[in-house]
Amino acid sequence: MPDLLLELRSEEIPARMQRKAAGDLKKMLTDGLVEAGLTYEAAREYWTPRRLTLDIRGLTARSKDIREEIKGPSTTAPEQAVQGFLRKAGLSSVADAHVHSDPKKGDFYVAHISKPGRAAEEIIAQLVPGIIRNFPWPKSMRWGPASAKPGSLRWVRPLQSVLCTFGPETEEPVVVDFEIDGIRSGNITYGHRFLAPGEITVRRFDDYVSKLEAAKVVLDADRRKEIILADARNLAFANGLDLVEDEGLLEEVSGLVEWPVVLMGEFEEAFLAIPAEVIRLTIRANQKCFVTRPQGEGEALSNRFILTSNIEARDGGKEIAHGNGKVVRARLSDALYFWTTDQGDLPDLGQLEASAEKFGLDLNKPLDQRMARLDHLNVTFHAKLGTQGERVERIRRLAEELAPTVGADPVLAARAAVLAKADLQTEVVGEFPELQGAMGRKYALLQGEHPSVAAAIEEHYKPQGPSDYVPSDPVSVAVALADKLDTLVGFWAIDEKPTGSKDPYALRRAALGVVRILVEDRIQLRLSSIFASAGACYAGSGADQTRDLLAFFHDRLKVYLRDQGARHDLIDAVITPQSDDLLQIVRRVEALGSFLDTEDGKNLLAGTKRAANILAAEEKKKTAVAKTVEPALFKENAEKSLFAAVNQAEKQAGEAIQNEDFSAAMLALSALREPVDSFFEGVLVNDEDLEVRANRLALLTRIRAATGQVADFSKIAG
């Protein structure tokens, strides 16, 4: 079967757009081909900085002929209805239609439409120009004289050529001929812009790849990544160094070169006085280079970095490395200035005394000065939630309140909360916002803060995603919870909640962070009381907001537990709208899951569900159910045994739950298994004596109540 090769060659495409653009091209073209009646065996996309390529294998040469029947109105229908049918069917008159008869509906018009299949080349030639014109680039441009005309072509960078060939392996492929804004498709591409810029005539994908490789273009982005990583590791090792690997940077750099050549540059060792994170970010952000570290020396960096060139220079890349080194030195000079400036006094100390007094700050300490300035400048956190200074005060109060619960020193928790946002006013964080927290920790240690306070300044942002670590130091935990809970309660109070896929303030991430901290650090916390104290300063906070926010946490907990492998039905069975201790919910789910894995658990579940089903049916029929169980009405020993077992199990399970020993509660309930089985085997619930029936139904309600202390068994599958 024929194969299709398509290449769209342009000026350099931004690296961050390449992967998605290639995927979009594949989806748009394959969807269009299928919609047009073609099928294919496989499709794969490729990309380099200057081209998007699609290789589609086993594409059918022609779409199938289609015979379509369009049913029309009755032959006695009004003229207007008949004319509408003719327009829809593309017929000029009723003479072109057929008349069908139906015993019930009578005679009616039918149009038989035959659509002959189309050649794949024709379909491709029609599809590709439309895809190019409607391509979903985040940003695009117009160029050249034609750009002044309405409707002129837009592309991410000027489009230079389109290659499009089609045909089976056994025949010479043909060029699929079409034109888009003066660019006519062909079988010509071009090699590397500098190393092999000449024309290349292409037949099909295999020789396309090999000819590009000969012309210094590695088409496969994953292979470019492998080349860069392997060569960078080897170059570092040859110089007694280890490469500091960075997957995000590797992805970006592979999108900057068509022919990767790895080189090494260096800078003065004096710059190693700058924190490693700052050096790494400076070199990464500005020069797209990798840093290295001496072999076997921990986290300390070396003064050498690795860059990726797009050309093979005659001097072996010495001038390229030297030029990059000059730029890196200039950037590191700026970073060193930021680093030293942040450790000095601010010029406006005299204006910061009121803020310092408010927060108990020591203006002899650089980080305290930055916090005082953050408050003094009235930096807005959110228009409806006040300034950063007001937010810090809320976090401090909440951290102090949470400290005893999480085992933290309230004084240290308050101090950490006050300094947590101070580094937002530092020069380094102003240049590299992603270092907020990490730089605060370094500055805190430099000014002699308690290690737990310094750690909390960095870790209060944690966890920032499902793969990020959860803080364990009690002071960090107190401030992390306070920060996230203040944010959530505040945005709920002003009614700015996540909707659908929109979550501009990352509230889902904040809630998941609270869930992970409470569950993974095994912290018991009544969220409702924290919501009340955190929301006391908001006019819009109240019982409705508390219920809604608690439901939001339940949703996040369900997502988290399902990702951990928990059964969704067990989670639903345990959670109630009032459940505000997330760790307790998790413990209940764990205990319930273990219990239901046993034979006693499975049988009790079956018996409990049977009792619940009988009760539901009788309650629906409004059958009388006694309010209490009357032992005097028992006729069978199985009734007496079940009643005694329920009384004991209910009492023991209740005591175990009070002690939060959910495994013991399940053990107590397991004693119901045999009495419940015996009851259903030997007792007819719907006795003819209505009083006896009502009493037996009341006994079933006791089973439901006893098990309901742990979970709603009716929600459990099985």
Curated annotation (Swiss-Prot):
GO terms for cellular component: cytosol. It comes from the Bacteria. Keywords: Aminoacyl-tRNA synthetase, ATP-binding, Cytoplasm, Ligase, Nucleotide-binding, Protein biosynthesis. The keyword Nucleotide-binding applies. Its EC number is 6.1.1.14. SUPFAM superfamilies: HD-domain/PDEase-like. It is found in: Cytoplasm. Its main location: cytoplasm. Coiled coil: none annotated. It holds the Pfam family DALR_1. GO terms for biological process: arginyl-tRNA aminoacylation; glycyl-tRNA aminoacylation. The keyword Membrane does not apply. GO terms for molecular function: arginine-tRNA ligase activity; ATP binding; glycine-tRNA ligase activity. Transmembrane segments: none annotated. It catalyses: tRNA(Gly) + glycine + ATP = glycyl-tRNA(Gly) + AMP + diphosphate. Belongs to the class-II aminoacyl-tRNA synthetase family. Tetramer of two alpha and two beta subunits. This is Glycine--tRNA ligase beta subunit. The lineage of its organism: Bacteria, Pseudomonadati, Pseudomonadota, Alphaproteobacteria, Hyphomicrobiales.
